[in-house]
């Protein structure tokens, strides 16, 4: 088996995790107490869904997941919620005190106490796997736990499981909506860690997903639950090929191989279609071509950044449901002829497609319509540098005055770490610029036109 462990860190990680596991359980027909009526082989299991669930001898299915937070409130909700019987109590780890939006607390003082316990649990889960394939890590980079503890844990995982893939779903601060004043500090410090210790990072940002919910689902005031359900659909689409059998299956390591041209250029943009409410879905036919156009539309991106301002290096299109390769090839051919969608000149083909016959499921009482087919696109584009430059700018404004820095230094951090992290991100912006620049021998040709 090729198992995958999910690690959910901090409030954002845990709440996205709730939405994901709720959806996985629906897709596989697993009850909130872990029973799965349709599964005939009790105890053992080489079914595809065993990549995400382990089975006990009594036929209970337990998610291969760990939830961690430095303060208990969010995870206590899981301990008392609908799915409380699904998780092993040891998989829900909480500390006593909060990281208080402070990277240094999550990374040095408070986080240090929990990290060994946490790695111990990871080891226990890893020991149950016959062929561990990698980790999915969920966290935000604006808060304290997600950014500080998140990067601490990723560092330690790199040491203990160096060869395993680490895919990271990180919620980045949005341009307008802010939940903390020190977000720019936490994000820059955390990204510095993500650069080194993750293989692929998927960028999400609340504002972009808010706008999607408002515009496409007609939700006046989207709540985090609405946002997380949408994110869960994306993550479910990425992992369907690991949990079900399909025509063109995509493995986790395939993401890396096809999307990451250089080790540092591994921050991906995700988009999903159809984001559509039940009333509308009834009147629209969502063909493969239409879905393919929609995912390239800047307004369906899950992070606030406009791909038209950059060039694509690679795209991964994951279709699910009633889709045949012929339609996909036709749709991709149309996209290639579009002038608005530009690829870097050193990557002529740039598309990887996956098809999975399992149609998308929806959470009952949720906002999304039940549809026959859906598409999730993961793209590597130079436009994602916008996200970094935005955060860097805010970081510079605050750091020039050394505002709030004493909170970090007081928790045992060195001030030099700030400038190191900032320089690393400046280098990253530069990398993105160079990757998108025209190759030297083309310059002459362009001027003649």
Swiss-Prot record:
GO biological process, alphabetically ordered: microtubule-based process
Positions of transmembrane segments: none
N6-acetyllysine PTM positions: 40
Record keywords: Acetylation, Cytoplasm, Cytoskeleton, GTP-binding, Hydrolase, Magnesium, Metal-binding, Microtubule, Nucleotide-binding, Nucleus
Catalytic activity: GTP + H2O = GDP + phosphate + H(+)
GO molecular-function terms, A-Z: GTP binding; hydrolase activity; metal ion binding; structural constituent of cytoskeleton
Residues at which GTP binds: 11, 71, 140, 144-145, 179, 206, 228
Subunit note: Dimer of alpha and beta chains. A typical microtubule is a hollow water-filled tube with an outer diameter of 25 nm and an inner diameter of 15 nM. Alpha-beta heterodimers associate head-to-tail to form protofilaments running lengthwise along the microtubule wall with the beta-tubulin subunit facing the microtubule plus end conferring a structural polarity. Microtubules usually have 13 protofilaments but different protofilament numbers can be found in some organisms and specialized cells.
Family assignment from sequence similarity: Belongs to the tubulin family.
PANTHER family in the cross-refs: TUBULIN (PTHR11588)
Identification of the protein by name: Tubulin alpha-2B chain
Organism: Physarum polycephalum (Slime mold)
